[in-house]
Structure formats: C-alpha cells, structure tokens
Amino acid sequence: MQSLVQSCADQVWPAEVAAVIASRPDAPGLEWAAERGIPTAALFHKEFPSREAFDAALAAEIDRFEPDYVLLAGFMRVLTPGFVNHYAGKLVNIHPSLLPAFPGLHTHAQALATGVRIHGCTIHFVTPVLDHGPIIAQGCVPVLAGDTPEALAQRVLEVEHHAYPAAARWLAERRVSLTADHRVDVQGDPNRLFIWPPASL
C-alpha cells in the first residue's frame, strides 16, 4: 500500500488516493496514511455475523469515496461474489506468484517445493474465482539455490514494489482495456513484464 501511495505522489499520477480502508483497526497502514492526510477507515471483520454482512458494509464504506478503482494490498480476506461483482472491472489485486501457478496461500513454499526457477507476482482484475482474473502485469524474480521461503518472499516483494505502482499508473492514465477474449491490453506497454533485479534472468 505504501509503495502505491508514495509512487502516486512522487510520480505525479493523474489520480489521487481517495482512501485507505482496512479490515483491522490496528493495521499499521492506517496510521501511515492518516499522517499523510489520506482519509482512512477500518471495519473489524470479527464484528460482523457473516462474510456477506462484512462485505456489504465494506462496499458501503468504499462507495462513500466514489473510487474509479479499488486496489487490494495486503488484504487477506476472500471476498464474496456479490462484492466482487459490485466492482467488476474496477477491483484489482496483487498475488505473490506467477498466476495461474500457485493460487492461494504459501506460494513461496510451493514454488520451492516444485523446483521452478522463476517466481514472482501477478497484478490482476479480481473475479469471483479466486486468483483467476485477467492479468494486468507480472513481475519475475529468479529462484536461487539455497533459497528459503522467507528469502524468496523478500525478492518477490521488491518486484511487487515496481510492478504494482506501474500497473496502478496505467489504470490512472486510462491505458488499460479488456479485449473481447478477456485479456488485458495496455496502450504503450505491450509486454507488461517486470524483471527484478534488472537483467537477472
């Protein structure tokens, strides 16, 4: 989240961060955002009787700010189909693997267990099928001999901090569109691939 906010300010995107909203009132990003004058809100998911009730309240909170896009960053809850469909074409997530490989949790351990030599992250539109939506961009890192899940996660985080802000800027500049076969096209950036460290692969 911080890399998105900072990139938006530093690179002077044609956009502003409307709000930062968390599912836990103690989320550290809330204080960080508030210190920078960004509106914040928190809805504690354990105070709601069901996922549907929480998602309905979350949607109502988001809609107060009338955003063009909703970007998930560190939001670890599975969203209900009703919520996802409410923001169809506007809801974006980052996942720590090169989808469609390794959906779900523990992606770095999965990558090491299967012996892949390249790992990374995927920025994608969210659909009701978990970790399955149209891919906006991907970031790649090498898997090195002796890697641990923690070491690999840190390397992936570095490429995330480049790929996600770039994808968000494309959205802000209205350069992202979906083709008839539900693939993403980005005007001016046909490759949509980030390699970290540069020239490492």
Labelled PLM ranges:
Residues 1, 29-30, 55, 108, ...:
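A general structural signal for well-ordered alpha-helical segments in protein cores
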Residues 1-28, 32:
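N-terminal Rossmann-like dinucleotide-binding module
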Residues 7, 23, 69, 73-187:
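Donor/substrate-binding cores of folate-linked one-carbon enzymes
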Residues 36-37, 87:
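Short, structured coil segments at secondary-structure junctions
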Residues 41-46, 94:
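Short beta->alpha connector loops at strand-helix junctions that form conserved
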Residues 61-67:
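Glycine-rich phosphate-binding loop signature in dinucleotide/nucleotide-binding domains
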Residues 181-201:
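Short, basic/aromatic-enriched C-terminal tail that caps enzymatic domains
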